[in-house]
């Protein structure tokens, strides 16, 4: 019987979740969807001092925005403490763990001596019970840690889906602390129990976890489990070549939403940030799931390129439905001081978006460029003096008169402009610039006929005539 694929995303809610973090959700999500398996969300919140509910919310919000739906969870490690203690008790009863009374100061001194002797700093097994070995007397009033009896010989090995065969000698691994003096279990132990209980078949995570893997495999086998398939993803670097982090200026996942990026663009970009399908650059979420495999995960660090993401976002904006973009733009209008009432009274927002979206790389840019349709223009005196000259004023008056009666279409408006230019022997910029300035408040707009059509007859004629009084 074939085992159903079960993957997981297991973030620690200790702050900021950036693109490098969320990629470790995207790939296991895609693999689970491709294999018709199960995607599990687990919140590893055992670092009580640093874990916050705000960080959990940011994780859930970021995943929801990108459409990374999970089938089971979220499971919280702090809510599973009874289960961890149960397994610890089983391990104690089986002789798989032992109490260690070595103090932090003693351990630090031991490691310093080892470093001075040119040895690898590691716990030396002072309190590890062995046949015929006499252990020190436990110090009074000291609560011990619990250490896992790591095998002393042999190797722990796995075939990593990204890095290939990895073998670590057990002699290199000391006996890991799996429970603190107060009885709370440690990270590596909780991870193993969770992966075992949740029947995880594939662990796709960052390669900063490679060093944890041999320890986790040994604990897993001691508990009677078999290791999952591991795929350790190379680091995501920022544009300066440093590991992506908040400290080095990374933006949060929802920060991209708040900057006007579309989720489909971010998913497409993230998919290519460490995986490839031939030369394909642009593909839908459905294509990504269909194509995704572990064999084509990159083996080298991937470097973030903001310009590439902006280019992808511009592509998806061009493809997006105008009504959807109009809704997404509303919060950005609010930031510009333009409320829903102003939007309702002004030009049709979906039509405005349709005119402007080909020039924008973010939804925020669309709102900024569209603001002129929902504000009263306030051109400065210098611009008015430069463009609304005595030479052009008669042409403006004739144009306003013509626009009162023409059919209100782009073609009819263009014809009225052309006729006015011919009658007054003007070039297009001589007329279009002042018209733009008086109607929109700026000399920089898309094609003048399209802009005037969206402003509407009453607004266009009224603003031109007001300037001529």
Curated annotation (Swiss-Prot):
Binding locations of ATP: 246
Catalytic reaction annotation: tRNA(Glu) + L-glutamate + ATP = L-glutamyl-tRNA(Glu) + AMP + diphosphate
Keywords: Aminoacyl-tRNA synthetase, ATP-binding, Cytoplasm, Ligase, Nucleotide-binding, Protein biosynthesis
Subcellular location: Cytoplasm
Example GO BP: glutamyl-tRNA aminoacylation
Short sequence motif 'KMSKS' region: positions: 243-247
Subunit description: Monomer.
Pfam families linked: Anticodon_2, tRNA-synt_1c
Region (Disordered): 114-139
Main location: cytoplasm
Basic and acidic residues: compositionally biased ranges: 114-131
EC number(s) per entry: 6.1.1.17
Name this protein carries in UniProt: Glutamate--tRNA ligase
Family to which the UniProt record says this protein belongs: Belongs to the class-I aminoacyl-tRNA synthetase family. Glutamate--tRNA ligase type 1 subfamily.
GO cellular component term, pick one: cytosol
PROSITE patterns on file: AA_TRNA_LIGASE_I
Functional summary from the UniProt entry: Catalyzes the attachment of glutamate to tRNA(Glu) in a two-step reaction: glutamate is first activated by ATP to form Glu-AMP and then transferred to the acceptor end of tRNA(Glu).
Motif 'HIGH' region positions after renumbering to this chain: 11-21
Stored InterPro entries: aa-tRNA-synth_I_cd-bd, aa-tRNA-synth_I_codon-bd_sub2, aa-tRNA-synth_I_CS, aa_tRNA-synth_I_cd-bd_sf, Glu-tRNA-ligase_bac/mito, Glu-tRNA-synth_I_codon-bd_sub1, Glu/Gln-tRNA-synth, Glu/Gln-tRNA-synth_Ib_cat-dom
GO molecular function: ATP binding; glutamate-tRNA ligase activity; tRNA binding; zinc ion binding
Gene expressing this chain: gltX
């Amino acid at each position: 019987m074939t085992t159903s694929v079960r993957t997981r995303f297991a973030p620690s809610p200790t702050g900021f979740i950036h693109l490098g973090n969320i990629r470790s959700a995207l790939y296991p999500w895609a693999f689970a969807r491709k294999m018709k398996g199960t995607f599990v969300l687990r919140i590893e919140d055992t670092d009580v001092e640093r874990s916050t509910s705000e960080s959990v919310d940011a994780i859930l919000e970021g995943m929801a925005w990108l459409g990374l739906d999970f089938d089971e969870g979220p499971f919280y490690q702090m809510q599973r403490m009874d289960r961890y203690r149960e397994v610890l008790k089983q391990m104690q009863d089986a002789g798989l763990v032992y109490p260690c009374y070595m103090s932090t100061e003693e351990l630090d001194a031991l490691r310093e001596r080892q470093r001075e002797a040119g040895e690898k700093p590691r716990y030396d097994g002072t309190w590890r019970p062995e046949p015929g070995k006499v252990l020190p007397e436990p110090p009074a009033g000291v609560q011990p840690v619990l250490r896992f009896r790591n095998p002393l010989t042999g190797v722990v090995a796995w075939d990593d889906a990204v890095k290939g065969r990895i073998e670590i000698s057990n002699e290199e691994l000391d006996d890991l602390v799996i429970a603190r003096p107060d009885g709370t279990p440690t990270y590596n132990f909780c991870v193993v129990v969770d992966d075992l209980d949740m029947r995880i078949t594939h662990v796709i995570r960052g390669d900063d976890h490679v060093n944890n893997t041999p320890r986790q495999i040994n604990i897993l086998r001691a508990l009677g489990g078999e290791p999952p398939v591991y795929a350790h993803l190379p680091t995501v670097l920022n544009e300066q070549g440093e590991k992506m982090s908040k400290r080095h200026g990374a933006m949060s996942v929802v920060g991209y939403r708040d900057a006007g990026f579309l989720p489909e663009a971010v998913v497409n970009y993230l998919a290519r940030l460490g995986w490839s399908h031939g030369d394909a650059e642009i593909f839908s979420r459905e294509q990504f799931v269909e194509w995704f495999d572990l064999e084509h995960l990159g083996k080298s660090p991937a470097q973030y390129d903001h310009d590439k993401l902006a280019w992808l976002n511009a592509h998806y904006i061009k493809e997006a439905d105008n009504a959807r973009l109009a809704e997404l733009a509303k919060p950005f209008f609010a930031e510009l001081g333009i409320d829903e009432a102003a939007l309702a009274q002004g030009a049709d927002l979906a039509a405005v978006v349709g005119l402007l979206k080909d020039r924008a790389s973010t939804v925020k840019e669309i709102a900024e460029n569209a603001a002129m349709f929902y504000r009263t223009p306030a051109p400065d005196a210098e611009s008015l003096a430069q463009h609304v000259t005595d030479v052009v004023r008669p042409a403006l008056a004739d144009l306003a008169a013509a626009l009162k009666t023409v059919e209100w279409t782009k073609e009819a408006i263009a014809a009225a402009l052309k006729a006015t230019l011919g009658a007054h022997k003007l070039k297009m910029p001589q007329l279009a610039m002042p018209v733009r300035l008086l109607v929109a408040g700026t000399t920089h707009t898309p094609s003048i006929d399209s802009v005037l059509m969206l402003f509407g007859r009453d607004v266009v004629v009224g603003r031109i005539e007001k300037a001529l009084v």
